[in-house]
C-alpha cells in the first residue's frame, strides 16, 4: 500500500515560530528592544560574503575609485570614526573594517554592513559637496547601523516572515512552494531597509560618534 510522505504538523511549525518570536529578543546600545533570531556573528559572515561579491563585481566593472585625494579623505574620516567605534564597542575591534569608494556620481549613498564593511558612492561628494564634518555625520550614522546589529535585525525580520510562509504552506499542503518562498525571502534579507526605529537609533549613535 502506498503511503503519503509525512509532512510537519502546521501546529508544530507554528509553535516553533512562536517560541522563536518570544525568545528572539535583544537589547540595542540605546536600550531599545530588538527582535533578533540570528547571531551577530552569523550576520557578519553573511554580510562579508555579500560585500566581497559586490566589491568583486565593481572591480570588474572598473568602478572602484583610486584617486589618491579621494581615497585619503575617506580613509582619514572613516578611520577616525572606526577608532572611536572600537574604543566604545571593543567587540568591533575584531571586525575586518574596510571601505570601498564607488565611482558613481549619480548615486548619493553610503552604507556599512555588519562587521564593518563600508561603501561610499562619489555622488555624495559630487552632488552634495559635503564638508568633512558632514561626511563624518553620514558615516557615523552608517557605522552605527553595524554597531547596533541592525543587519541581524533585518535578517531576523526576513527569517520570521519565511517561517510564517512555511507554516502556511504546511497547513495548506503546499510546503514546496512555501519553502521556495522562504528561501527567496532569506536571500533578499540583506537588501531590506532598516526600520524607522533603527534609523532613529543610528541618527543618535552616529551623532555621538561624529562629534567625539
What are these regions (language model features)?
Residues 2, 24-212:
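A Zn2+-metalloprotease active-site environment signal
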Amino acid at each position: 500500500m502506498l503511503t503519503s510522505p509525512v509532512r510537519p504538523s502546521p501546529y508544530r511549525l507554528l509553535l516553533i515560530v512562536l517560541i522563536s518570536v518570544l525568545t528572539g529578543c535583544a537589547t540595542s546600545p540605546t536600550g531599545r528592544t530588538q527582535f533578533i533570531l540570528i547571531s551577530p556573528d552569523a550576520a557578519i559572515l553573511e554580510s562579508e560574503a555579500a560585500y566581497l561579491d559586490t566589491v568583486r563585481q565593481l572591480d570588474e566593472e572598473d568602478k572602484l575609485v583610486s584617486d589618491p585625494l579621494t581615497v585619503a579623505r575617506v580613509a582619514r574620516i572613516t578611520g577616525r570614526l572606526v577608532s572611536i567605534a572600537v574604543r566604545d564597542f571593543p567587540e568591533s575591534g575584531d571586525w575586518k573594517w574596510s571601505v570601498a569608494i564607488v565611482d558613481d556620481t549619480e548615486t548619493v549613498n553610503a552604507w556599512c554592513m555588519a562587521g564593518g564593511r563600508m561603501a561610499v558612492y562619489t555622488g555624495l561628494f559630487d552632488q552634495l559637496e559635503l564638508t568633512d564634518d558632514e561626511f563624518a555625520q553620514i558615516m557615523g550614522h552608517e557605522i552605527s547601523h553595524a554597531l547596533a546589529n541592525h543587519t541581524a535585525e533585518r535578517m531576523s525580520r526576513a527569517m520570521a516572515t519565511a517561517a510564517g510562509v512555511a507554516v502556511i504552506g504546511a497547513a495548506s499542503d503546499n510546503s514546496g512552494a512555501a519553502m521556495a518562498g522562504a528561501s527567496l525571502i532569506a536571500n533578499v534579507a540583506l537588501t531590506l531597509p532598516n526600520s524607522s526605529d533603527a534609523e532613529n537609533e543610528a541618527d543618535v549613535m552616529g551623532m555621538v560618534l561624529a562629534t567625539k
